[in-house]
């Protein structure tokens, strides 16, 4: 999801999205460790999505953007 899409969501929706992304990242790491993960690039995508969401949340806290 792009940063502009996160800006259109409510704070609660973004926080819920971050929680689900963290769970997905946790599962992806386990799949990687057990050799079941085929698309390792998904880990990077999920990490970037978490960062985007947290950035938007922080901008809201500071009143930026």
From Swiss-Prot:
Origin superkingdom: Bacteria
Keywords from the UniProt entry: Ribonucleoprotein, Ribosomal protein
Keyword match Ribonucleoprotein: yes
GO cellular component: cytosolic large ribosomal subunit
BP terms from Gene Ontology: translation
Keyword Ribonucleoprotein: yes
Xref: CDD domains: Ribosomal_L29_HIP
GO molecular function: structural constituent of ribosome
Disulfide bond positions: none
Gene3D superfamilies per UniProt: 1.10.287.310
Alphabetical list of NCBIfam families matching this protein: L29
Family to which the UniProt record says this protein belongs: Belongs to the universal ribosomal protein uL29 family.
The protein, known as: Large ribosomal subunit protein uL29
Gene: rpmC
